[in-house]
């Protein structure tokens, strides 16, 4: 029994941790409370269900930090990346996936693995014995959250996350909208036409901003403050920061030409991205919102091309919980006060599907090695994996710790390279070349250790 690894939570991190440990020869039990106990955001009992966007963001492994993380996870035989690649949708230079088949594939492969078992039960305490990884994500249950708070002696940290709406494709007016990826990015025609675009002139944009600002919004409970992760700000919060903010953010009109009016430059553009392989659903890019349902329908139908739109899902808001990991976790993601317990995924203060799965990958491998009595080399800080784990387990300032996406700002500088915008391309290539070499060497040492 003591050699079995228990993983609490079957999201991105928990699924990847289970796969990695099982592939190392460890018997794994996944404790997933769904569907017995549901959450605000989840709709199924599948493992690795995508509840927000369907995008894994950029797949460029030379000029983008998250693309580099994709590369490192593929090199490590990652389940999440394998399933994402199998259910990839056209999205320009991004990696977007068909969310339901993706989750079904992850679920099926874990259920089929001879060393993995899955049990539908809620874990509400921090066990004192055995080997555990808690990957309960931002929607950690109240009972478990209370147990973590009691153990750490500190209030759980939290921010608010918002979900974008999804539209039925056949209700979009294509006499006003058109298909084009920004700057025609992509190697195939399908990639170059991966986004659906709805243009606005200045008057339409100003009216849209007015409607956003006036719309009814979800109220917070007493004692809750509206702290958001910057990468997932509700559009109405962005609008409150300035009337031009959206036009320089998700509604920027650059790199696009309207074939219906090729000589007219749009003042702003709303983009929609395909949400499933059939092309029957599109999500509105960057339009996560906390508006009430009635207000959402009214406001979004003012967008040219969406006047008669029907919504498969409206947006919403939920509270996300995360640990002050620099204070509570050691360099191997173990709880300092309970070293038999590791944490992984979004609850550790990384933000995003890919980052969560990446920390699950490391937690699974680290736990497997510990159970087998093997000492793994330190994860190289020059890799994307190493930059992330270093940040959450000590590199970040504990007093101001907030959820973080992977980015090149977490990487150590490369000597002798020009700073600023002019040197950025060479600098990013140097980061990714160095990272790939470091990660490849670590994997080889880890396998032979």
UniProtKB/Swiss-Prot annotation:
Disulfide bond sites: none
Keywords in alphabetical order: Cytoplasm, FAD, Flavoprotein, Methyltransferase, NAD, NADP, Transferase, tRNA processing
InterPro entries (UniProt xref): FAD/NAD-bd_sf (IPR036188), MnmG-rel (IPR002218), MnmG_N (IPR040131), TrmFO (IPR004417)
Gene Ontology cellular component terms for the protein in this record: cytosol
Binding-site residues for FAD, renumbered to this chain: 9-14
Recorded catalytic activity of this chain's protein: uridine(54) in tRNA + (6R)-5,10-methylene-5,6,7,8-tetrahydrofolate + NADH + H(+) = 5-methyluridine(54) in tRNA + (6S)-5,6,7,8-tetrahydrofolate + NAD(+); uridine(54) in tRNA + (6R)-5,10-methylene-5,6,7,8-tetrahydrofolate + NADPH + H(+) = 5-methyluridine(54) in tRNA + (6S)-5,6,7,8-tetrahydrofolate + NADP(+)
MF terms (GO), sorted A to Z: flavin adenine dinucleotide binding; tRNA (uracil(54)-C5)-methyltransferase activity, 5,10-methylenetetrahydrofolate-dependent
EC number, UniProt record: 2.1.1.74
Record's subcellular location: Cytoplasm
Presence of keyword DNA damage: no
Any GO BP: tRNA methylation
Cytoplasm in keyword set: yes
Cofactor(s) listed in the protein's UniProt record: FAD
Job description of the protein: Catalyzes the folate-dependent formation of 5-methyl-uridine at position 54 (M-5-U54) in all tRNAs.
HAMAP family xrefs: TrmFO
Family membership noted in the UniProt record: Belongs to the MnmG family. TrmFO subfamily.
Protein name per its UniProtKB record: Methylenetetrahydrofolate--tRNA-(uracil-5-)-methyltransferase TrmFO
Organism listed in the record: Ruegeria pomeroyi (strain ATCC 700808 / DSM 15171 / DSS-3) (Silicibacter pomeroyi)
Taxonomic placement: Bacteria, Pseudomonadati, Pseudomonadota, Alphaproteobacteria, Rhodobacterales
Gene assigned in the entry: trmFO
């Amino acid at each position: 029994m003591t050699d079995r690894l228990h993983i609490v939570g079957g999201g991105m991190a928990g699924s990847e941790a289970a796969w990695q440990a099982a592939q190392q020869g460890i018997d794994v039990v996944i404790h997933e409370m769904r569907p017995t106990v549901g959450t605000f955001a989840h709709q199924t009992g599948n493992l690795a269900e995508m509840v927000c966007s369907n995008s894994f963001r950029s797949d460029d492994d030379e000029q983008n930090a998250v693309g580099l993380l994709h590369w490192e996870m593929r090199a490590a035989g990652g389940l999440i990346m394998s399933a994402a690649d199998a259910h990839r949708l056209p999205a320009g230079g991004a990696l977007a996936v068909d969310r339901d088949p993706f989750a079904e594939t992850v679920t099926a492969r874990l259920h089929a693995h001879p060393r993995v078992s899955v049990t539908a039960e809620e874990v509400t305490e921090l066990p004192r014995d055995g080997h555990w990884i808690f990957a309960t994500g931002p929607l950690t249950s109240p009972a478990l959250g209370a147990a973590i708070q009691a153990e750490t002696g500190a209030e759980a940290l939290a921010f608010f996350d918002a979900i974008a709406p999804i539209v039925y494709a056949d209700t979009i007016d294509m006499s006003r909208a058109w298909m084009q990826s920004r700057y025609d990015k992509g190697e195939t025609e399908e990639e170059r036409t991966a986004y659906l675009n709805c243009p606005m002139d200045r008057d339409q944009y100003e009216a849209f901003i007015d409607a956003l600002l006036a719309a009814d919004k979800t109220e917070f409970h007493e004692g809750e403050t509206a702290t958001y992760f910057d990468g997932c700000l509700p559009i109405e919060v962005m609008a409150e920061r300035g009337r031009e903010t959206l036009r320089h953010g998700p509604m920027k009109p650059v790199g696009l030409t309207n074939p219906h009016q090729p000589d007219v430059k749009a003042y702003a553009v709303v983009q929609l991205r395909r949400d499933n392989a059939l092309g029957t659903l599109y999500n509105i890019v960057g339009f996560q919102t906390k508006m009430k349902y009635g207000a959402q329908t009214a406001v979004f139908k003012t967008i040219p091309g969406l006047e008669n739109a029907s919504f498969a899902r409206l947006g919403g808001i939920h509270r996300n919980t995360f640990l002050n990991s620099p204070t509570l976790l050691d360099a191997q993601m173990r709880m300092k006060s309970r070293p038999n317990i590791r944490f992984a995924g979004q609850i550790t203060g990384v933000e995003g599907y890919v980052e969560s799965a990446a920390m699950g990958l490391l937690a699974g491998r680290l736990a497997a090695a510990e159970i087998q009595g093997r000492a793994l080399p330190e994860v190289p800080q020059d890799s994307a994996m190493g930059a992330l784990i270093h940040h959450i387990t000590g590199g970040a300032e504990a007093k101001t710790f907030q959820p973080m996406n992977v980015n090149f700002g977490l990487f150590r500088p490369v000597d002798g390279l020009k700073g600023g915008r002019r040197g950025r391309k060479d600098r990013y290539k140097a980061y990714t070349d160095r990272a790939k070499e470091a990660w490849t060497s670590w994997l080889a040492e880890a396998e032979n250790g």
